């Protein structure tokens, strides 16, 4: 079975193709990978394709998304990156969809009704849901009636109970859809399953905190394989300090800025999402690698940004542990979680009262899908390579007609 996965961002489009005869226990390598970056130049986009040991870069003459996706799919069947004889050989297509609202608690075959729901939720995910719809419609144009599956970032968190998912605001606001949805659900679910598998323990028996630390970052409290709490909320702006996002702040700050300094909603939205977090405090970058480099050079604001990041991370790990009423496994994943030994080390300090102890040598040895806790630690600490594309492909396998 050939499974195509599309993962659309606000300014990029990633895709890969898996060729499966059976469902393996661990993530296989896709036979083809591609990505489109629409931010390189206002006049054109850059398509990068990897297949058959070859990497190609192609400038696309248009910023038109459907045309770009069609050109990307063309590299599956033509040129040096050809891996299938005909696009009709693709059995099913899976899409990452950021926001599924309260309607979907699991992956779903895409129908006109599902498309309408994704469209209806655009106000809650204005940068992403339109891109997902464009991807779905581009596949319809190029591949016709091939089955398509939507895998929602919010679905895994539908199990969060009302005491955590609702805000302490006038109750009627919740009837307007204002509630905590949570995001990164596909990653959180995959990592919890993978951690249990690597530890050789039943998922149902474990209490885990999953730390998805990338440019966007969130934690989830996973009990018995179900999400019971998370740090992102109504939008991906809530929770942890992130690369360029503020995370949780006193909402009174926004009222003050609007009233006293005439800030408007659009400018506040831009500042909180794109000019805050590590970038806002350091004045350097939202990239953790740039922050740690500047720290090593003695930059005090970079040091402050890092210390704030760790403080807020540890505070919210504590919040997740409180929701779980205990902890068996702490998992680090995504760009920072997988690659920054320093972040993992600092985030794991101070928990000795809880029986958590890191093995510093293992932590520094570029671990991947490994337990980096000491032998005597009562809490296991895992580094899991997130595999959202594979998780989407796996859902397609299970839903395939």
From Swiss-Prot:
It is an enzyme of class 2 (transferase). Mg(2+). Can also accept Mn(2+). One of its GO terms (molecular function) is ATP binding. The gene is ackA. Keywords: ATP-binding, Cytoplasm, Kinase, Magnesium, Metal-binding, Nucleotide-binding, Transferase. GO terms for cellular component: cytoplasm. Belongs to the acetokinase family. Catalyzes the formation of acetyl phosphate from acetate and ATP. Can also catalyze the reverse reaction. This is Acetate kinase. ATP binds at residues 14, 212-216, 287-289, 335-339. The active site is at 153 (proton donor/acceptor). The keyword Metal-binding applies. Its cofactor is Mg(2+); Mn(2+). Its main location: cytoplasm. Pfam families: Acetate_kinase. Its EC number is 2.7.2.1. It comes from Microcystis aeruginosa (strain NIES-843 / IAM M-2473). Pathway: Metabolic intermediate biosynthesis; acetyl-CoA biosynthesis; acetyl-CoA from acetate: step 1/2.
């Amino acid at each position: 079975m050939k499974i195509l996965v599309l993962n659309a961002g606000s300014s990029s489009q990633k895709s890969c193709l898996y060729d499966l005869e059976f469902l393996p226990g661990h993530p296989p390598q896709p036979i083809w990978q591609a990505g489109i970056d629409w931010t390189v130049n206002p006049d054109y986009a850059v398509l990068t394709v990897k297949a058959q040991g070859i990497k190609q870069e192609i400038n696309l003459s248009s910023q038109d998304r459907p045309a770009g996706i069609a050109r990307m799919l063309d590299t599956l069947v033509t040129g040096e990156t050809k891996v299938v004889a005909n696009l009709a050989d693709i059995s099913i297509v899976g899409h990452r969809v950021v926001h599924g609202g309260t309607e979907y608690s699991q992956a779903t075959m895409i129908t006109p009704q599902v498309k309408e729901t994704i469209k209806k939720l655009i106000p809650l995910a204005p940068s992403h849901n339109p891109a997902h719809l464009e991807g779905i419609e581009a596949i319809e144009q190029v591949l016709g009636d091939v089955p398509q599956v939507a895998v929602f970032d919010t679905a895994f968190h539908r199990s969060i109970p009302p005491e955590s998912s609702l805000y302490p605001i006038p109750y009627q606001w919740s009837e307007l859809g204002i509630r905590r949805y949570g995001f990164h659900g596909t990653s959180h679910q995959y990592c919890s399953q993978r951690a249990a598998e690597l530890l050789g323990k039943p998922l149902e028996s474990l209490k885990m905190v999953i730390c998805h630390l990338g440019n966007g970052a969130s934690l989830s409290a996973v009990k018995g394989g179900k999400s019971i709490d998370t740090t992102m909320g109504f939008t991906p702006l809530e929770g942890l300090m992130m690369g360029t996002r503020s995370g949780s702040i006193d909402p009174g700050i926004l009222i003050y800025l609007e009233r006293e300094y005439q800030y408007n909603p659009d400018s506040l939205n831009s500042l909180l999402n794109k000019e805050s977090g590590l970038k806002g405090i350091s004045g350097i970058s939202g990239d953790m690698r740039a922050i740690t480099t500047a720290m090593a050079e003695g930059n005090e604001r970079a040091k402050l940004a890092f210390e704030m990041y760790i403080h807020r991370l540890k505070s919210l790990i504590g919040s997740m542990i409180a929701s779980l009423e205990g902890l068996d496994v702490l998992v680090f994943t995504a760009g920072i979680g997988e690659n920054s030994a320093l972040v993992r080390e600092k985030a794991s300090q101070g928990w000795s009262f809880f029986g958590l102890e890191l093995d510093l040598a293992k932590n520094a040895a570029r671990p991947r899908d490994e337990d980096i806790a000491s032998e005597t630690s009562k809490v296991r600490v895992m580094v899991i390579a997130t595999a959202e594309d594979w998780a989407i492909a796996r859902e397609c396998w299970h839903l395939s007609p």
